[in-house]
C-alpha cells in the first residue's frame, strides 16, 4: 500500500521531468558544399543561433520544451568577419552568423513546436521558397519524418529564380494577395503546384493542406541538408 501511494506521488513529478527535458536536434550537412546552419524562433536565437558547417560536419543543439514556431535552415554563399557580421546570398538573417531572427527568402525551412500539450509538431515548408534539399526526421520512435529533396533549383520557373541562387516563392516575387494570402482566402496557384509536385511532404503556400507530423513530446530530431547525397555515398 505504501509503495502504491509513493508511486502516485512520484508519477506527476516524473511526468513533469519528462516533459521539461530539452529536445536534441542534430543538424547535418551532407551537401558537397559549405552551408551556414541557422536556428531561431523569430524573436531570439535557438542555442547559438548559427554555425558554419563544412561538407560532412554536424552541429547538435538543445531546444527548450515549449518552444513554439522554431525554424532551422541552411544559408549559402556566406561571408562573415571575426565579429560574426557578414552576409549570405540565401537565408541571410540580418547579417549575423548567429541568427536572432528568421532568414530572408529563399529558404527551405524545418519548422517545429515542442511539447504543445504533450505533443511535438514538425514540418518542412517551401512557403518562403527553396534553397537546399532537406530531411527532417525523429531520432526516437513514435512518428515519421518528412523530406524535400527534389531538384527544385534546377527546375525552378524563370520568374522565381533568385539572383543569389535558390528558388523564390511567388509571394516574395509578386507581392500580391493571390500569392501571399493577405485576405485570408487563397488557393493553390501554378507556382505552389510546382513546389507541391516536387515536394508533396512540404507546405507549398500559406493555406496548403496541412502536412504537419505529430510526434510524442520530448522526441529528438535530425535535420539533414542534401540527404540524398548521403544515400548515394552509402550505395
Swiss-Prot record:
InterPro entries: Osmotin/thaumatin-like_sf (IPR037176), Thaumatin (IPR001938), Thaumatin_CS (IPR017949). Keywords: Cytoplasmic vesicle, Disulfide bond, Signal, Taste-modifying protein. CDD domains: TLP-P (cd09217). Its main location: cytoplasm. It comes from the Eukaryota. It is found in: Cytoplasmic vesicle. SUPFAM superfamilies: Osmotin, thaumatin-like protein (SSF49870). Disulfide bonds join 31-226, 78-88, 93-99, 143-215, 148-199, 156-167, 171-180, 181-186. This is Thaumatin I.
Amino acid at each position: 500500500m505504501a509503495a502504491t501511494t509513493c508511486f502516485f506521488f512520484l508519477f506527476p513529478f516524473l511526468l513533469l521531468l519528462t516533459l521539461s527535458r530539452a529536445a536534441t536536434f542534430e543538424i547535418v550537412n551532407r551537401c558537397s558544399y559549405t552551408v551556414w546552419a541557422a536556428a531561431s524562433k523569430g524573436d531570439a536565437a535557438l542555442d547559438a543561433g548559427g554555425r558554419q558547417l563544412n561538407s560532412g560536419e554536424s552541429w547538435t543543439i538543445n531546444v527548450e520544451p515549449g518552444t513554439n514556431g522554431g525554424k532551422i535552415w541552411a544559408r549559402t554563399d556566406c561571408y562573415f568577419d571575426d565579429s560574426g557580421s557578414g552576409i549570405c546570398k540565401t537565408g541571410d538573417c540580418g547579417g549575423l552568423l548567429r541568427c536572432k531572427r528568421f532568414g530572408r527568402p529563399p529558404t527551405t525551412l524545418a519548422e517545429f513546436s515542442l511539447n504543445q500539450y504533450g505533443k511535438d509538431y514538425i514540418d518542412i515548408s517551401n512557403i518562403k521558397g527553396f534553397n537546399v534539399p532537406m530531411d527532417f526526421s525523429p531520432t526516437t520512435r513514435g512518428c515519421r519524418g518528412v523530406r524535400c529533396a527534389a531538384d527544385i533549383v534546377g527546375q525552378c520557373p524563370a520568374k522565381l529564380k533568385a539572383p543569389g541562387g535558390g528558388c523564390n516563392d511567388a509571394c516574395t516575387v509578386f507581392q500580391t494577395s493571390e500569392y501571399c494570402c493577405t485576405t485570408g482566402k487563397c488557393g493553390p496557384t501554378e507556382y505552389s503546384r510546382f513546389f507541391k509536385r516536387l515536394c508533396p511532404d512540404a507546405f507549398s503556400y500559406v493555406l496548403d493542406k496541412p502536412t504537419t507530423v505529430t510526434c510524442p513530446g520530448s522526441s529528438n530530431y535530425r535535420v539533414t541538408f542534401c540527404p540524398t547525397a548521403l544515400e548515394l555515398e552509402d550505395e
